[in-house]
Amino acid sequence: MKTASGGLARRKGTSMARLKNGKHRRKDGSWDPLKDSSTDRQTAQVIPRTPQSASSSYTLAYVDDEFLCREELRPVRLQLELLKTEMILTERNIKSTVVMFGGARIPAPGQEAWAAKNDIQKKNLENASIYYDQARRFAQLCSNQSKSSDYHEYVVVTGGGPGVMEAGNRGAADVGAPSIGLNIVLPHEQAPNPYVTPELSFNFHYFAIRKMHFLMRAKAITIFPGGFGTLDEFFEAVTLIQTKRMAPIPLILFSKAFWHDIINFEALANFGTIAPEDLQLLHFAETAEEAWQIIADFYDLNAEAAP
């Protein structure tokens, strides 16, 4: 029925922005008259079982695991992995992060080097426990800064696993701050470390999408001693910054001695495969305080804290 002004009249007792049960159709409260997919998913579970309805072809596409895992659906799965984490972080109003990369095999002080295959590795890994302590302390410093923004800025993010990753999440938990864990399915059994905030604990199939999420909100990246995974993450970040596919942000390597043993950066510049000025993309730190000061200076956080 139209009103005198030509508009459609609302039926008495109804709200255009709410369903009959009083709940908004969408989280933002906007009206959506289309039936939602979760309702149909529930309805489809109780339909009469017949040869036709029992066929896999009859299963709703978006709840058909076998269909979603088909090779042809890889682009869809890539999009889903990107969207799920992005939507949750947006809903939590996570605006920026501090990324912590580092070895899963580095034990906490006093713990045995579980990954060591011989006495030399055992000694080296247990000596490397100093980086666990520094990572934990660094995460505390980041999280103290994050508190001033109600934990929307400078939120610690790690790979969610053991070693340096655990130390990062643990440091945030020490000061009552949330932290993010971006875990990935690996051939051996792995669970997220117990210090990741449960609502910010994510799991990935695709390394590429996982690395995108590490960098999409990053205000700084720290790289502690680690193995192939840490090197992969480091080179991804430094390449994006060097090629200007990513804004310059502090890229901080912990332990100059370790990294110079592993990679001869100066040799790359001398050989001409990188420019001498590319070396300026790298910062080195020995302690959590040194690393945090690099970030504070870059973003002028000391001035913000001044009375």
Predicted regions and their residues:
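C-terminal functional extensions of proteins
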Residues: 253-307
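Residue-level recognition of the N-termini of beta-strands and the immediately preceding loop/turn
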Residues: 152-155, 248-250, 279-282
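Glycine-rich beta-alpha loop segments
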Residues: 28-36, 40-182
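Phosphate/pyrophosphate-binding betaalpha-module
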Residues: 157-224, 228-229, 235
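Solvent-exposed alpha-helices and their adjacent loops that cap or buttress functional pockets
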Residues: 90-93, 148-150, 173, 193-195, ...
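N-terminal amphipathic/basic-hydrophobic helices that include classical n-h-c signal peptides
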Residues: 1-23
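Short, solvent-exposed amphipathic alpha-helical segments in soluble enzyme
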Residues: 115-116, 173-174, 236-241, 267-271, ...
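Short, acidic/small-residue loops that bind anionic groups at enzyme active sites
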Residues: 176-189, 224, 238-262, 277
